[in-house]
Amino acid sequence: MATTPDPSRRRLLGSLAFGACNAILPVGWSADEPGLESSARSTRRVGIAAAGWAGVPCVSVELRDEEQQRVLRTGGNGPTYAIVPVPFSAGTLEVDVAAELTGRGAPEARGFVGVSFHVDEAAETYEAVYLRMTNGRLNRPMPPAPRIDRAVQYVAHPGFHYAVSRERYPGRYEKGADIGLGLWHRLRLEVERSRLRAMVDGREVLAVDDLRYAGREGPIGLWIDDGTRGYFRRLRIS
């Protein structure tokens, strides 16, 4: 169960709206262009823009051209996220996510989209839970084994990405899920000390009891990876 935020932190939270997209963010931020895109920041690796997907307003996050080319040369799994500068250590993160393939990634691109947290000051180390949308059980045709059991993933950067956890602890940090490419899904992360519970559309899909950066406070990230355009809306942090 997620921890209850400190009352003083609650007083720092307000609400901004982007069409049908709501984000709970610190009071005092610019409301000239209210919404998720006015609080999330692009980085040298990813760009963020106002968008619409499946009939609803949202923001899109995608690798910049030079980063996409680097990923094709050397592989992904880097700090590829737009920064939402809200201090977070423990509590609950919720956001609607969707993804599409850009056609610019490797053949193994799976529609990678999720949330990073416990991000350090340099925005280089982090933990994340992400979805591989093409590996979900709602795709038609359904993906073959073992992909169908690899739709949700926990990682810590650097040093603990899927290849490491898959080799050392097969099936422990990745699970199957009822998700699909091009569909909206509600991703919820509950973080308490070294424990994490991940839910998709109200159903628990992954539990981790040994977070690598437990207790670290830092911003969160709207995370994507190779060959993916990720869509985000209704971000909520509590």
Say what each PLM segment does.
Residues 1-8, 18-22:
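N-terminal secretory signal peptides
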